[in-house]
C-alpha cells in the first residue's frame, strides 16, 4: 500500500490558503477516485482508501496543524506498517514560483516547519511533491501571513486547470514506481 499525505491546516478558514494547496490537490484526487475522507482520531488524520494505477492507496490529510504533520504521518505508517519508500508527501513550497512542481526524494526542511516535523518523526527518506506558491506578494506580507492568505482568483484557477492535473499525474507515477527527481513539472505561468 502507498500513502499519499498532503500537508495543510484543519478548519474552513484555511481551506483555500496557500498552506493548504496540498490538501486541495488531494481532495481533487479523492473526488476523481470516488473516495470519501473519514476522520480517524487515532491516526490524527482524515483518510480515504482509493485505487490508483491499479494499486491500493491511502490518501491522508493530517488533522493536526501543518507544523505537527509528523505526528500523524508516524501514526499512519505504524498502523499500516509501510516503509518510507511507500510515502509521498504533497506540500506547498515558498522557494518555488507559483505553479512549479518539483519532486524530491529526501532533503532538509529548508525552514518549512511541517517538513521539519516530518523529518523529526520519519527521517528524510520519503518522496515529496513540492508545489510552488511564491509570488511578489510574499515580500510585502512576510512568510507567516503569506502562507495563510487565500489563493488569488487567478491562482485558484491555475490550481484547477494545471496544478491539480500535474499533481495527479505525478501521484500516478509514484504509485506505479516511475517517479524520480527528474519528474519535475512546470505547468503554469506566473499569475
Annotate the PLM regions.
Residues 2-106, 116-129, 136-142, 157-190:
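Nucleotide and nucleotide-moiety/phosphate-recognizing core
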Residues 111-114:
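Hydrophobic alpha-helical segments within soluble ligand-binding/sensing domains
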Residues 154:
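Electrostatically charged, flexible surface regions
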Amino acid at each position: 500500500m502507498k500513502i499519499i499525505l498532503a500537508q495543510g491546516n484543519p478548519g474552513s478558514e484555511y481551506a483555500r490558503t496557500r498552506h493548504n494547496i496540498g490538501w486541495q490537490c488531494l481532495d481533487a484526487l479523492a473526488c476523481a477516485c470516488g473516495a470519501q475522507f473519514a476522520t480517524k482520531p487515532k491516526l490524527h488524520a482524515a483518510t480515504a482508501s482509493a485505487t490508483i494505477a491499479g494499486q491500493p492507496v491511502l490518501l491522508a490529510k493530517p488533522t493536526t496543524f501543518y507544523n505537527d504533520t509528523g505526528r500523524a504521518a508516524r501514526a499512519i505508517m505504524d498502523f499500516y506498517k509501510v516503509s518510507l519508500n511507500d510515502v509521498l508527501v504533497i506540500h506547498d513550497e515558498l522557494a518555488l514560483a507559483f505553479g512549479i512542481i518539483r519532486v524530491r526524494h529526501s532533503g532538509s526542511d529548508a525552514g518549512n516547519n511541517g517538513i521539519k516535523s516530518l523529518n523529526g518523526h520519519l527521517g528524510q527518506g520519503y518522496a515529496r511533491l513540492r508545489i510552488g506558491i511564491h509570488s511578489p506578494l510574499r515580500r510585502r506580507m512576510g512568510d507567516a501571513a503569506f502562507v495563510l492568505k487565500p489563493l488569488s482568483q487567478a491562482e485558484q484557477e491555475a490550481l484547477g486547470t494545471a496544478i491539480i492535473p500535474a499533481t495527479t499525474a505525478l501521484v500516478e507515477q509514484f504509485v506505479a514506481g516511475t517517479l524520480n527527481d527528474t519528474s519535475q513539472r512546470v505547468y503554469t505561468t506566473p499569475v
